[in-house]
């Protein structure tokens, strides 16, 4: 089952070893020196490849570990100790220092980590200068003895040792890459969130990578000292650190021989261009830019991706059901998951409160409503509850996500979190480690590989398993993520929107799979917007409203519950001010949407939608979460490109226009979640709305008009918008949209998260805008609320318009509730 890359590795290393040994005995003394420097640079490159290629960290301070290795080796050999003892001592010391540096440094990532490693290199450099009694200060260490063995030429001996070290480093990397350690590092690199949900502690993986990288660099440095016979702090310039990183990136990070190719470049190019030494960094900088432009994965990385294609390996047509059942039912948590009165606040917002649930083994539970993903994040350890208990055999509340995963909870995500550079099979195999690294070179057994293939077949994946997961289609990504979660052998499986973007046929297959998993004894907790799926497979539903449970029951009980219907459609307490007079505007459509199709994955989220908005109308788009309402508004505003169909604004096509151009033409979006600029004042937030206009703006007069419309904002006009309440921020967002003087104001979920009082004030303002002749297109989860102010409405279900008509007609339509809660519902 080994792919071509795996088979080529050991053979290629052997060929390189043989070629290098021949070269050692064939080269003259100067060429031999250059060859040895290339070998040592390759070892450093392999070390950095562990850090960059496997764990995704960056270090511009590896010259410090190179120097540490060189000085320790020099001091030991000058003290009369043999080189064979000095080399491992130098490597171990560098590795230990690397681990100590990594533990605090890896609390940060990206550019911050790079800055810490740069600072470390300067600390080491100045320590070498100031610690004169040991390091010789600026004068350095001289007379470093050459190694001796059987009367061999010391230069040849050093070259052979450097070659052996390079070959050993390559063999080490090749074994590490395919081991449990390597899989864990690559998983953390691709997605720390997903890695934690499989039981991996990212700090441990990254610390090990840093330590191994520093160890290899220290080993290389230990041979530099006898090679040069003299070292001082200037032997280790900071610019060399940059060149080491460049060698890995240009050669191809994550590839076996990329660092070797990169080492040849950074050592040989200066030799070939010795007359232009002062331009060395400039030349390498240009080289880096050219390579990344032509080959963004590095030279060897691009070659491997384009020309080395493994023979496709697919899951078996027949599944060993007994093996899968034994594996998935092999947990001890027969009493299931207990959640008691959990809650959490974010700032001043109570996101969830008093949530309790018992999910027995072998059951499918469907939390739904506002706050469901927050509850999922608390169960899986990504959020720590402020109150309450979570138990699965033992208390879990407050444990980090990786410990929660090891306790028997696995999950998927709304947006798939696969390890993109890893193969489909490795994505599943890494989950079987259950967060444990094992021995350094341990590999997946044949039995594990066969089980992984069975799990992929179980979920319905039929594609190649030895291709990168990032190349998968959307539906296959969903299936592989579920298979990966199952590979962790959880007692509880949390599924967050698993049907998003799936076709109806794929969704039906998912329903069958979920029932099969429950039959294996798994507890399945399903968060899903597809209410037909939820109602079909769930044994019980927990319905949340603003993070607070309102009912628990069977699907049939939930569908009949008046509190649920009110939560999904909106209550009827609010009474909007009726229109001053019935709408009697022009029938020349201001906005026309024809056969609109919007794709995010394998299946369209909006399919052949047609709608019309006339001048002066308030039109609402209604439907359950995930029906496609917000996707339509984002597409109209130019934030997402339609797959097909047309959008006409005043009879001009705008479906291919940019978001800024569409705003300039007269469509202003008030986005979901308000999205004010928190550090700007209310006044500045409002002014930003007028920037798309092409006429002269009388800012003071127009802001005064906004303040008259929303009197609450007057006393807060100079306050940072981030300090306002949610309702006040929504008023700022609406005011910002009005400052654009739009032809149509698009409003996306304006009532979301607001108190009843604030909703009333906001909707009174929308009714006033309607009566003034402002054209509005409104999306709101609260159907009854939207129908209070709308003239007409369209009802969406799974991306299709299933009903349209006047607001009065739809308020009396019993089928409206079915669009939100599934079939068989009556309001």
State where each predicted segment sits.
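ABC ATPase NBD Q-loop/coupling interface
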Residues: 389-406, 646-664, 807
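Transmembrane alpha-helices and adjacent helix-loop boundaries
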Residues: 2-318
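Helix-to-loop junction immediately C-terminal to a conserved catalytic motif
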Residues: 380, 637
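The feature captures the beta-strand-to-loop junction immediately N-terminal to the Walker
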Residues: 365-367, 622-624
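Catalytic Walker B motif of ABC-type/P-loop ATPase nucleotide-binding domains
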Residues: 493-497, 745-748
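A short, surface-exposed alpha-helical micro-motif characterized by mixed small hydrophobic
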Residues: 534-536, 786-788
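Conserved catalytic motifs of ABC-family nucleotide-binding domains
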Residues: 489, 741
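ABC ATPase C-loop
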Residues: 486, 737-738
């Amino acid at each position: 089952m080994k792919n071509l890359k795996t088979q080529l590795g050991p053979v290629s290393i052997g060929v390189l070893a043989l070629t290098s040994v021949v070269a050692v005995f064939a080269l003259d003394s100067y060429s031999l020196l250059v060859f040895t420097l290339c070998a040592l640079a390759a070892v450093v490159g392999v070390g950095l490849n562990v850090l960059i290629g496997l764990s995704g960290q960056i270090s511009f301070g590896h010259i410090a570990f190179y120097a540490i290795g060189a000085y320790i080796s020099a001091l030991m050999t000058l003290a009369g100790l043999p080189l064979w003892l000095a080399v491992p001592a130098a490597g171990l010391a560098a590795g230990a220092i690397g681990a100590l540096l990594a533990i605090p440094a890896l609390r940060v990532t990206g550019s911050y980590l790079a800055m810490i490693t740069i600072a470390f290199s300067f600390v080491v450099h100045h320590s070498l200068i100031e610690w004169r009694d040991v390091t010789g200060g600026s004068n350095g260490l001289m007379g470093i003895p050459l190694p001796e063995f059987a009367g061999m030429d010391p230069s040849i001996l050093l070259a052979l040792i450097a070659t052996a070290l390079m070959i050993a480093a390559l063999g080490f990397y090749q074994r590490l890459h395919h081991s449990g350690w390597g899989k864990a590092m690559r998983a953390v690199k691709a997605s720390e969130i997903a890695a934690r949900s499989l039981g991996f502690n990212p700090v441990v993986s990254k610390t090990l990578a840093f330590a191994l990288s520093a160890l290899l660099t220290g080993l290389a440095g230990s041979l530099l000292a006898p090679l040069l016979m003299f070292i001082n702090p200037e032997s280790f310039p900071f610019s060399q650190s940059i060149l080491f990183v460049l060698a890995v990136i240009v050669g191809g990070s994550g590839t076996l021989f990329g660092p070797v190719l990169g080492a040849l470049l950074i050592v040989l190019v200066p030799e070939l261009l010795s007359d232009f030494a002062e331009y060395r960094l400039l030349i390498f900088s240009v080289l880096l830019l050219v390579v990344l432009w032509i080959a963004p994965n590095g030279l060897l990385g691009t070659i491997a991706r384009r020309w080395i294609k493994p023979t496709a390996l697919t899951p078996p047509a027949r599944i060993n059901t007994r093996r899968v059942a034994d594996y998935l039912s092999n947990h001890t948590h027969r009493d299931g998951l207990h959640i008691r009165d959990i809650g959490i606040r974010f700032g001043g917002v109570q996101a969830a409160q008093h949530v309790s649930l018992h999910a027995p083994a072998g059951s499918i539970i469907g939390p739904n409503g506002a706050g469901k993903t927050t509850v999922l994040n608390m169960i899986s350890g990504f959020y720590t509850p402020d109150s309450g208990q979570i138990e699965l055999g033992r208390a879990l509340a407050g444990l980090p996500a990786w410990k929660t995963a090891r306790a028997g909870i696995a999950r998927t995500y709304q947006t798939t979190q696969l390890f993109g550079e890893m193969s489909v099979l490795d994505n599943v195999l890494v989950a079987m480690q259950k967060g444990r690294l094992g021995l350094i070179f341990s590999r997946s057994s044949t039995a594990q590989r066969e089980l992984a293939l069975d799990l992929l077949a179980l979920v319905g994946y039929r594609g190649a398993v030895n291709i990168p997961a990032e190349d998968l289609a959307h539906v296959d990504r969903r299936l592989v993520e579920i298979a990966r979660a199952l590979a962790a052998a959880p007692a509880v499986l949390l599924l967050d929107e698993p049907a998003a973007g799936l076709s109806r046929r794929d969704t039906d297959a998912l329903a069958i799979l979920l029932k099969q998993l429950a039959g294996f004894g798994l507890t399945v907790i399903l968060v899903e917007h597809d209410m037909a799926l939820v109602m079909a497979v769930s044994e019980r539903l927990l319905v949340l409203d603003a993070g607070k449970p309102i009912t628990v029951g069977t699907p049939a009980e939930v569908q009949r519950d008046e509190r649920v219907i009110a939560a999904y459609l909106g209550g009827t307490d609010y009474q909007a001010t009726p229109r001053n007079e019935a709408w009697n505007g022009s029938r020349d459509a201001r906005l026309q949407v024809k056969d609109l199709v919007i794709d995010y994955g394998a299946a369209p989220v909006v399919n052949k939608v047609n709608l019309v908005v006339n001048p002066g109308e308030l039109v609402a788009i209604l439907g359950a979460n995930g029906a496609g309402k917000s996707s339509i508004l984002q597409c109209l505003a130019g934030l997402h490109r339609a797959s097909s169909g047309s959008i006409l604004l005043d009879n001009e096509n705008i479906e291919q226009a940019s978001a800024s151009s569409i705003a300039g033409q007269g469509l202003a979006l008030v986005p979901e979640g308000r999205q004010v600029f928190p550090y700007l004042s209310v006044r500045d937030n409002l002014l930003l709305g007028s920037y798309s206009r092409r006429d002269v703006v009388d800012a003071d007069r127009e802001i005064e008009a906004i303040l008259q419309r929303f009197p609450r904002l007057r006393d807060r006009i100079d306050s940072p918008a981030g300090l306002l309440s949610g309702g006040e921020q929504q008023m700022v967002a609406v005011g910002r949209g009005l400052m654009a003087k739009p032809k149509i104001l698009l409003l996306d979920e304006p009532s979301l998260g607001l108190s009843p009082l604030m909703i009333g004030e906001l909707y009174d303002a929308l009714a006033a805008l309607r009566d003034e002749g402002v054209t509005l297109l409104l999306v709101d989860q609260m159907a009854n609320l939207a129908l209070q102010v709308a003239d007409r409405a369209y009802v969406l279900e799974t991306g299709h318009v299933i009903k349209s008509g006047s607001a009065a007609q739809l308020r009396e339509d019993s089928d409206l509730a079915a669009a939100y809660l599934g079939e068989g519902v009556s309001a």
